[in-house]
Amino acid sequence: MPELPEVETVRRGLELVTLKQPIVDVEVLLARSIALPKEPQAFIEHLRDRRIEQWQRRGKYLLATLDDGSRLVIHLRMSGQLLWLTTPQPPCPHTRVRWFFPTRAELRFVDQRTFGRCWWLPPDCRVAEAIPALATLAPEPLSEAFTVAFLAARLAHCRRSIKTALLDQSIVAGMGNIYADESLFLSGLHPTQSAHTLTPEQVQRLHGVICQVLREGIAAGGTTIRTFMSPAGVNGHYGGQAWVYGRKGEACRVCGTTIERLRLAGRSSHYCPQCQPLSSAIGK
């Protein structure tokens, strides 16, 4: 699933090519890709002839403000892509929604797994009421509101493993498997350590590392594991510099120990047994 750095990369790419341009037409090829309105034709009619004034990101959600005050919200979920095409092309496999712009350009939503969703919300609609998951998101991790004190308070009574806790969007908005593994490695924390057992010093270090890793991910244009690419069709480059994620069986870049992988709550976790010793996983 695209995580904060990947979604931010998409947001920046969309701002470069779609702002102020009228949406000439919309085509919906898979009805269930549209969450609201319930009828795809209504989605099409509300977006036709509108202009995108701004793109924002909240966690893993993309939010476009239109010239009439309405919103277009998109969540890429597991495999969604938003691709910008400057010349007409027939729909590729897994094309779900197409937005057409002047000069025959097209924004195309491609989603192999079909979990991605699009919402059109009227101007008087509160976004968090229409999409309840938005109401529970933690502050943006690169904002001033995401403080050490906030993170400490959220972890203090959390009995889950620290890896599972980091994937909770009410604790770290936009965090996913890749950057959680990277953050834990750089913090020296074993993924199975209970979140509530972290010392104040460990929480402070983890907070700083989360911000560092996410900034590095954004600077690298995200990570391409299987399907992610920017609207311009460019792969993310963070994966090539990853410390542990996706490197099972390879040597740790710090100590040379073989990177291992385990399963936690149905998700894979990559770690270095030497740099993230099991002895740190106290109080489980």
UniProtKB/Swiss-Prot annotation:
Which family does the similarity line name? Answer: Belongs to the FPG family.
Name of the molecule in the record: Formamidopyrimidine-DNA glycosylase
Subunit and partners:
Monomer.
**Entry binding sites for DNA:** 94, 113
Xref: InterPro entries: DNA_glyclase/AP_lyase_DNA-bd, DNA_glyclase_Znf_dom_DNA_BS, Formamido-pyr_DNA_Glyclase, FPG_cat, MutM-like_N-ter, Ribosomal_uS13-like_H2TH, Znf_DNA_glyclase/AP_lyase, Znf_FPG/IleRS
Q: How is the cofactor bound?
A: Binds 1 zinc ion per subunit.
Under Gene Ontology molecular function, one entry of this record is: zinc ion binding
What UniProt keywords are attached to this protein's entry?
A: DNA damage, DNA repair, DNA-binding, Glycosidase, Hydrolase, Lyase, Metal-binding, Multifunctional enzyme, Zinc, Zinc-finger
* SUPFAM superfamilies from the UniProt entry: Glucocorticoid receptor-like (DNA-binding domain), N-terminal domain of MutM-like DNA repair proteins, S13-like H2TH domain
What is the protein's species of origin? Synechococcus elongatus
Q: Output the superkingdom of the source species.
A: Bacteria
User: Keyword DNA-binding: yes or no?
Assistant: yes
Active-site positions on this chain? 2 (schiff-base intermediate with dna), 3 (proton donor), 60 (proton donor), 267 (proton donor)
